[in-house]
Amino acid sequence: MTSIESHPEQYWAAAGRPGPVPLALGPVHPGGPTLIDLLMALFGLSTNADLGGANADIEGDDTDRRAHAADAARKFSANEANAAEQMQGVGAQGMAQMASGIGGALSGALGGVMGPLTQLPQQAMQAGQGAMQPLMSAMQQAQGADGLAAVDGARLLDSIGGEPGLGSGAGGGDVGGGGAGGTTPTGYLGPPPVPTSSPPTTPAGAPTKSATMPPPGGASPASAHMGAAGMPMVPPGAMGARGEGSGQEKPVEKRLTAPAVPNGQPVKGRLTVPPSAPTTKPTDGKPVVRRRILLPEHKDFGRIAPDEKTDAGE
């Protein structure tokens, strides 16, 4: 990069210098009677004839040079002052931009550090919600299973309430047994409710309904069989079911084994292609016979015994 150097003092000095001296008139021959004298006089006059224009041009050039020197001195001085002011402004702007850049960098660094810290509570809440979802689903499943068991028990009680003969048995129990009339044997309630996690199965020892039939005489079975103890007779099936209904039995797990698929195991190895056997193709027609043809010159000149035998064999 080239630098521009200016010297305003020298420019002002050049502008203040005196002007050039005008050209003086040259000597003119006085002339004479001869032709040579006349020619010399004409030459002197022609030389001095253009001195006025030459002096005017020299003075104009000097004036223009002085004006340019003064203009350069003024412009360079003003340009230097303007450049100094611009440099001061650029320095101030650079400081402001540097300060703004430093502030932006600090804010970006603080944002990068504070961003994860501000997201920690939200992430903790999301983790807590994720941990609570399995517990809530388990509680909902448990509540659903209890509700289904209660509904099944209510349906069984409603179905048993309308059976014939239960009213008389209950009445006899009130008379003979005191407070035993308000209870219902478990044999009449049917099988216990099956958990929802296993397929519904019914034990073979728990009948769904009582097989008790009223006697033909019209008397209630409880009054006919009441003895000294005052307790009603209970069918054997009901007694067996009462002991079994005290606790919920788990259904028997069944395992199904699918038959194995023949040749269903994966096969590992490499497949090697056997080399192809060479095939021979019979040629159609007779085999081609090659014959040797000798020119007459070859037979006459340079013929030897092996050539004779070869020609005879062919």
Swiss-Prot record:
Residues 165-184 have a biased composition (Gly residues). One of its GO terms (cellular component) is plasma membrane. Residues 294-314 have a biased composition (Basic and acidic residues). It is a multi-pass membrane protein. Residues 203-212, 219-232 have a biased composition (Low complexity). Residues 190-202 have a biased composition (Pro residues). The keyword Transmembrane helix applies. Residues 165-314 are annotated as: Disordered. The chain crosses the membrane at residues 23-43, 98-118, 221-241. This is Uncharacterized protein Rv2083.
